[in-house]
């Protein structure tokens, strides 16, 4: 049986009559992400609550852990990637505890076990931001104590929510999906430009994703950057020698069984005669809607189309 996911929220505290994180956590109970069911837990806003998950980890294992809490002064959700080794309460916790300028362990700051650079955050609900300051209150203490106990790489972080958010539940589900999906594979994608047009190549019937159109390229090999990868891959796929130009951008796409980070660069033919090895057709395009693109390649084609005016004589 697949390990469960743990999502925690907090009860109300201080001047707040409700805590948005409590309702969000409760709403996720029993939901499933990539075959893992969610268990929800509401924590008290005190030492016992901050240490509860760390104690549970003595006898339970989870596929992923998200702590959710309220950041009343934030305008955007915050993905916290660091738990600071300090407590300095501005108000007492719900047990009356008021800790001032105190270390949690004395061992230094701890870092969340996630890779937000692989998450394509700009496409996520309500535009979350990555933060390295979880504060000096119970939220920070809870994340710190949980991270102290994790020794197997279980993905875990703290999500701070603003007072008002349109779809906090949807955002948490997006975070969990990214925590559990495969790590990104770096792939080069070449925007071959010639005579004011760019090249699209159709995958042959013997290839994965047969019949779909893409930009030529492939996976980085050890020690390669995007330019080196594309020079090698386009030679292998099309028998063309190329020079790389400006970087167009990066796109992350989840194919289900694999997640790729596409590094897209302008490319220019410098030699060779085109011969197709993994494709069965090519088209020179001057817009994004001339072929049926694979994955995010239509968005890439749109970005490249906007640049073509700089390459027309």
Predicted regions and their residues:
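N-terminal catalytic or cofactor-binding beta/alpha core of small enzyme domains
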Residues: 1-136, 146-152, 156, 170
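Active-site-adjacent mobile loop/cap segments within catalytic or ligand-binding domains
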Residues: 138-180
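Short, well-ordered beta-strand micro-motif
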Residues: 160, 192, 264-268, 284
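Charged phosphate-binding loop/patch that engages nucleotide di/tri-phosphates or the phosphate backbone
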Residues: 165-182, 296-313
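Conserved N-terminal beta-strand and adjoining loop/helix that marks the start
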Residues: 182-199, 219
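Conserved Nudix-box catalytic region and its N-terminal flanking loop in Nudix hydrolases
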Residues: 197-236
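Active-site segment of metal-dependent pyrophosphate-handling enzymes
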Residues: 235, 239-271
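NUDIX/MutT-family hydrolases
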Residues: 266, 275-307
């Amino acid at each position: 049986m697949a390990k469960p996911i743990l999502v925690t929220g907090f009860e109300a505290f201080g001047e707040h009559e409700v805590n948005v994180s409590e309702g969000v956590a409760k709403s996720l109970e029993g939901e499933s992400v990539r075959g893992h069911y969610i268990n929800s837990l509401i924590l008290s806003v005190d030492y016992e609550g901050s240490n509860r998950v760390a104690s549970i980890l003595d006898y339970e294992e989870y596929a992923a852990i998200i702590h959710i809490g309220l950041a009343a002064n934030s305008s955007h959700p915050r993905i916290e990637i660091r738990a600071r080794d300090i407590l300095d309460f501005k108000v007492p916790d719900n047990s009356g505890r008021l800790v001032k300028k105190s270390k949690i362990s004395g061992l230094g700051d701890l870092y969340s076990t996630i890779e937000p650079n692989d998450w394509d955050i700009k496409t996520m609900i309500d535009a979350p931001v990555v933060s390295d300051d979880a504060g000096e209150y119970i939220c920070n203490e809870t994340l710190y104590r949980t991270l102290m106990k994790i020794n197997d790489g279980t993905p875990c972080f703290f999500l701070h929510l603003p007072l008002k958010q349109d779809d906090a539940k949807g955002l948490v589900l997006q975070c969990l999906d990214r925590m559990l999906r495969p790590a990104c594979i770096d792939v080069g994608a070449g925007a071959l430009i010639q005579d004011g047009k760019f090249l699209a190549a159709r995958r042959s019937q013997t290839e994965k994703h047969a019949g779909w159109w893409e930009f030529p390229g492939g996976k980085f090999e050890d020690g390669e950057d995007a330019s080196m990868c594309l020079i090698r891959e386009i030679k292998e796929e099309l028998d063309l020698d190329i020079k790389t130009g400006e970087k167009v951008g990066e796109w992350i796409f989840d194919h289900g069984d694999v997640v790729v980070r596409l590094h897209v660069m302008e490319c220019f033919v410098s030699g060779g005669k085109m011969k197709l090895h993994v494709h069965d057709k090519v088209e020179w395009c001057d817009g994004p809607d001339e072929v049926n693109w694979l994955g995010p390649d239509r968005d890439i084609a749109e970005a490249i189309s906007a640049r073509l005016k700089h390459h027309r004589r």
